[in-house]
Regions:
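Short, Lys/Arg-enriched N-terminal segments with co-localized hydrophobic residues
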Residues: 1-11
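Metallo-beta-lactamase
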Residues: 97, 103-104, 124-129, 134-207
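Core dinuclear metal-dependent hydrolase active-site scaffold
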Residues: 15-18, 28-29, 115-141
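Conserved beta-strand hairpin/beta-sheet module of binuclear metal-dependent hydrolase folds
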Residues: 12-57, 139-149
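Active-site neighborhood of phospho(di)ester-bond hydrolases with catalytic His/Asp-centered motifs
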Residues: 40-41, 62-69, 88-92, 129-132, ...
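Active-site HxH/HxHxD metal-binding segment of metal-dependent hydrolases
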Residues: 38, 45-124, 201-205
Length: 207
């Protein structure tokens, strides 16, 4: 795991990255330095490993946040929710996705969508709907961090040829991200983190 810290006001945003499973899915444990609770983003595999890391950090899980519903991002959700009693947030548009893409593992307790702001684990989380990879993909903004799921990667973007994907929607979502004025450090669903400024400059899908 890597543990970057970001200053937000007089507090620190802590981001712990676990890369899980055969597809190398990035799962993020995110918490405020003053809080003993955390949010877990996209626990796709090995829930026992995620829970072990949370426990080692002395935290409890307040919520699971899903950027989208593909099986490699949701496979550990049900077990973590059962163990902790936490809520699980998902964009309602993901419910239209063909079930074979979720491997029957889609589980949630609450929905969120465009323009929603959540206050969880001492964090303020803004939701941007970014369809394309899936019908209900979202990016999550926490301070100057963007959790982009499979919408934006370092040097690339998510596939749109899966059932429920849309190239037209993806192009519109990427244009929207390219239009954001603030610079964010981008934490994607796969691969290394990057910055939005770097992607605007070098990523052909954002130009």
């Amino acid at each position: 795991p890597i543990y970057p810290q970001k200053k937000i006001g007089d507090r620190m945003l802590n981001i712990h990255t676990l890369t899980l499973g055969d597809y190398g899915t990035n799962c993020y444990i995110v918490h405020d330095s003053a809080s003993k609770t955390c949010c877990v983003i996209d626990p796709g595999y090995t829930p026992e490993k995620v829970l072990s890391e949370v426990n080692a950090l002395g935290l409890t899980v307040e919520a699971i946040l899903l950027t989208h519903g593909h099986f490699d991002h949701v496979g550990g959700v049900r077990e973590i929710a059962a163990e902790t009693g936490c809520d699980v947030y998902l964009c309602a548009d993901e419910l239209t996705m063909p079930p074979q893409m979720t491997a029957g593992q889609l589980y949630y307790t609450k929905t969120y969508g465009e323009g929603d702001t959540l206050h969880l684990a001492g964090l303020t989380i803004s939701v941007i709907r970014t369809p394309g990879h899936t019908p209900g993909s979202v990016c999550l903004l926490i301070g100057d961090a963007m959790f982009s799921g499979d919408t934006l990667f370092a040097g690339s973007c998510g596939r749109t040829d899966f059932p429920g994907g849309s190239d037209v929607a993806m192009r519109a979502s990427l244009r929207r991200l390219a239009g954001l004025s603030a610079d964010y450090r981008v934490y994607p669903g796969h691969g290394m983190d990057t910055t939005l400024a770097e992607e605007k400059r070098y990523n052909p899908y954002l130009r």
